[in-house]
Amino acid sequence: AWVYDPEREQRPIVLLAGSAEEASELRDHFVRVGIDNVTGYITSLDGLDLVTPKLVKPEELGTFEHTLLLDVRNKTEFAAGHLPEAVNISGGRVLWALDQLPNNGTIVTYCQSGVRNSIAASVLRSQGYDVVELEGSYLGWVAVSGNTPVTEPDLIEAA
């Protein structure tokens, strides 16, 4: 649900799968959650155009022209520490929060280490936004700025 809204999306889905059997099983999972326009599968990315995302280094962010600095981590991570002037929309909600984003200009995105960010940035690009990813994400910025990184609290056993 991070990258696909079945109510708005009309493009057919092609799955990346190891075999026809695996593709069929994956299609069944999609159908169970209301996504029924899976039309085929591929077994390799060979021959496909791959996008190399634009990046901005943490030390260049202060002089880099952008309209919005978007933190796609969860609310708890954001509350524990974030980049100055950042706006928080969890990566899993970006597709449903497009009305909160500027129509023009460049959006710089980041998460904790870069994984969720790459997904959220890809979603925004698919919707026509100009997106630049913060190299190293939050942890990269922390390393350059000297700020204390946010760490996840240990899980405790429930009684």
Give short role names for the model-derived ranges.
Residues 1-159:
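Rhodanese-like catalytic fold shared by cysteine-dependent sulfurtransferases
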